[in-house]
Amino acid sequence: MEFLLHILAGAAVGFAIGLTGVGGGSLMTPLLLLFGYPAPVAIGTDLLYAAITKAGGAVSHHRRGNVDWKIVGLLAAGSIPVSILLHSFFLDISFQESPGFESLLTFSLGVMLIVTATILIFRDKIRLNAVEERPEFFMHTIHRSRSTVTFAMGLLLGACVTLSSVGAGAFGAAILMTIYSQTSAAKIIGTDIAHAVPLTFIAGLGYLSSGYVDLMLLGSLLVGSLPAIHLGSKASNQVPDKVLQQILIVLLLGLGIYYSFI
């Protein structure tokens, strides 16, 4: 019965991912916490779930020429070492057994859910500002130090994703949209997904090595979600985008506030 429930949960989140493009960490990790899984297990399992579900999308975007591998490399040069360093710290048993361990993870999750919801609220404004409304000196500064800024943002993403499993989607795309304002939306999304795969995989392996991944749970979630993502993407043209976005924002804000203050 529990296995069936996990398959249905995977299908629900997978359908949401296909429908909206958001939901891997933002919905799956809170759902696993509601099922009663400890925060490290929920985050670790979701990270490997995200790596597997995003891999197909990365391949698809690469085939269409929608991945800038130079940007992926710059982001990964910052994010992956940070993830490994954080896991080296977490692997200290005395810290894992302290009351602050789970509290740090749930607080990080709550903050990132609020950040993701805020980005969704202002997504159109961010896109408009990135192309039309930024001061010339700001554009010049960003362009001149773009590689350094991208590397620095990789450091930030590595920390956020490792601590919360959230951030590789909407947050990462918003960062890229700001830095690379002349790049097409399709290439921004493809590049963001391509970077998310190695980051979530490495971060997930760190949790797995500490015993914080439930492989049976992971398998059942994938059984439900992989076909559901395809169905959700097909249904996305039939459902008003505004309605979906508003429901998602309310849900993410509510969960974010809850996990930030419990």
PLM segments and residue spans:
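Juxtamembrane transmembrane-helix boundary motif
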Residues: M1-A9, F35, R63-L163, T178, ...
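Juxtamembrane transmembrane-helix termini in multi-pass membrane transport proteins
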Residues: G14, T20-V72
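Alpha-helical transmembrane segments of multipass membrane proteins
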Residues: G14-F15, L31, A58-V59, G158-A159, ...
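Residue positions within transmembrane alpha-helices of multi-pass solute transporters
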Residues: G23-G24, A55, P81, L85, ...
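Interfacial segments of multi-pass membrane proteins
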Residues: M28-V41, F171-K187
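Transmembrane alpha-helix boundary and packing residues in multipass membrane permease domains
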Residues: P30, D46, H87-S88, A170, ...
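Transmembrane helix-bundle signature of multi-pass membrane transporters/permeases
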Residues: I43-A51, A76, I80, I189-V197, ...
